[in-house]
Amino acid sequence: MIASMKPWPLVMVAALCILFCLGTLVDAYPTKPESPGPDATPEELAEYMTKIRQYINLVTRQRYGKRSSPETLMSELIFGENSNSDHSSRSRFDDSYMW
């Protein structure tokens, strides 16, 4: 007899993997601080403002380095690394056919 596989275990495993991946993505992004409300003390407002400042600094921080988009990756594969900088630093007199 041939045992038939039921699809529900595979569906459950796939759903759990998707939920796990979504959970890690949600935890990676910082949450916005809660507002203290209209009747907050000056100390609570100062603490809220420092939390907001830290939140904004995290969300809008500059990312240093070259960003890799699919276009730049393909141009690096085809033309070699730093193909854009080669063209910008060359002069028109560097070409041998000019002389």
From Swiss-Prot:
Residues 1-28 form the signal peptide. InterPro entries: Pancreatic_hormone-like, Pancreatic_hormone-like_CS. Expressed by the mandibular venom gland. GO terms for molecular function: neuropeptide hormone activity; neuropeptide Y receptor binding; toxin activity. The keyword Secreted applies. Keywords: Amidation, Cleavage on pair of basic residues, Hypotensive agent, Neurotoxin, Secreted, Signal, Toxin. It is found in: Secreted. Residues 68-99 form a propeptide. Coiled coil: none annotated. The modification Tyrosine amide is found at residue 64. Pfam families: Hormone_3. GO terms for cellular component: extracellular space. The keyword Secreted applies. It comes from the Eukaryota. Its main location: secreted. GO terms for biological process: feeding behavior; neuropeptide signaling pathway; regulation of blood pressure. Belongs to the NPY family. Shows a potent unique triphasic action, rapid biphasic hypertension followed by prolonged hypotension. This is Goannatyrotoxin-Vere1. It comes from Varanus eremius (Rusty desert monitor).
